[in-house]
Amino acid sequence: MVRSVFALVFAAVLLGGCASVPSSSAPQAIGTVERPAPSNLPKPIPGMDPDVLLREFLKATADPANRHLAARQFLTQSASNAWDDAGSALLIDHVVFVETRGAERVSATMRADILGSLSDMGVFETAEGELPDPGPIELVKTSGGWRIDRLPNGVFLDWQQFQSTYKRNTLYFADPTGKTVVPDPRYVAVSDHDQLATELVSKLLAGPRPEMAHSVRNLLAPPLRLRGPVTRADGGKSGIGKGYGGARIDLEKLSTTDSHSRQLLAAQIIWTLARADIRGPYVINADGAPLDDRFAEGWTTSDVAATDPGVADGAGAGLHALVGGSLVALDGQRITTVEGAFGRMGDQTGAALSRTGRLVASVVTLRRGAPDVAASLWIGELGAEAVQAADGHNLSRPSWSLDDAVWVVVDTNNVLRAIQEPASGQPARIPVDSTAVSSRFPGAITDLQLSRDGTRAAMVIDGRVILSSVEQTQAGQFALTYPRRLGFGLGTSVVSLSWRTGDDIVVTRNDVGHPVSYVNLDGVNSDAPARGLQIPLFAIAANPSTVYVAGPQGVMMYSASSAEGQQSWAEVPGLMVTGAAPVLPG
């Protein structure tokens, strides 16, 4: 049941971009902003049965404004004074109240399924399991009807009301290299479109979610702040970001002076607003002057296109594949063995092009399945020679970061980076600290892929999808931190994975009915079409437009632009060869 609920939610995310699902609240933390309550929230009415009143109270907690004022209408004054609504909210469904009734007082205990949590920053994460007993709830009869007189601290939020009240939006922060922006999805309970821009910029100023604080850069960090609410480009207060009205953002206390940093600052704002359907031009001022004199009349997404989070890496490189253990390029319906080492070497079992499409990392595995199996990692330019960068009994499929380092897992639990030394030209092997991952999820890492911005790593551990942040320490070393599980509905069926976008992972599974599924950063999973696929699927590669999988009949593809009536996988001409595996930048 949980999987079907999440599947419906995630389908809405894919189709709508800004789906009618979870989203956060106020410009600072949830509940601190004063604004009118959404019109769809219930209110207590005389004659309301205690069970109904409790359920309506859970719905009213969906509005965090004014310290959950809408929900406090269901409480006595003493209960409202005592109730601590700070911190994260638990999202619950299938709620059952077990009541002991008296003429003037009702005592109730609550049972429910946990579907997720919503932090005070608006960060939603899926979860599963039964709600531990939160403690008794007491109701008393008053002159205005039944009211809650005692309740546990914390917020329990009705799942259905959550979906109808909150909207998913994405904040963007800069990656450490300054080449692109990184998604940070949030859930926002703002029904007035003209308030949304102020809400989102305020959240940018408040910073990234805690687990990304050391993985991204925020060019809008303090002391920078908003001088006032976001308006239309001409200063008007209605129609913000609609039509040609644009948006005007007035900042103050700017400390960023160099042009590139100001460009990144603008990119964070522009992509955050543009992805929320708040259209430009974007007039961005700082301390009473244009952020950049070149764009005094307003910025557009074209002005920050170099950081576009939706662009496919190395798109010009095209699709490659491993066929018969060697790397080939697909030219129309013909395959051509690439020149150089990667075309000559046999026994290649996993490969990836660099983010630019100019370099290749490939794993060669000898004596597969034998006790003395041996694997080695080779790195080089596409069409040229290669150097050995690592070895072991087995190596995971390689993955490239934005700084042209190759990440690989050696012998199922040793994560390392291989990067070319500028002086010698030889690759250096640098261990990655994965203690946080192995401590919480101690199984074998059978696949590891970096997100396109390089700030997150998705792994397959014991058939589950595990996400972690990528942090660089002050000493220059790298670590995988804050691991958490995604896609509880996938069980332990996951075989391999690939990042489709910075917010969306696609996985292959050993599930006959659902061999390919999606899961996003929130942990919400949904199933891709299965028609036309045969299992087992042993490899996957994806970009924003197309997903490629390797199965018994060869390489199959599914396009995001497929018509709704054509929900089936298509053969990739030239790659319908047993054992062929797709290779893309990533």
UniProtKB/Swiss-Prot annotation:
Q: Which InterPro entries match?
A: GerMN, Lipoprotein_LpqB, Lipoprotein_LpqB_C
Q: Pfam families, from UniProt?
A: Germane, Gmad1
> Which NCBIfam families is this protein grouped with?
PRK13616.1
* Highest rank taxon of the organism: Bacteria
Signal sequence annotation = 1-17
Similarity annotation: Belongs to the LpqB lipoprotein family.
Q: Where in the cell is it found?
A: Cell membrane
Where are the S-diacylglycerol cysteine lipid anchors? Answer: 18
Q: Where is the lipid attached (N-palmitoyl cysteine)?
A: 18
Keywords assigned by UniProt, alphabetized: Cell membrane, Lipoprotein, Membrane, Palmitate, Signal
Instruction: Give the residue ranges for region: Disordered.
Output: 26-45
What is the protein's membrane topology class? Lipid-anchor
Question: What name does this protein carry?
Answer: Lipoprotein LpqB
Mind naming one GO cellular-component term on file for this protein? plasma membrane
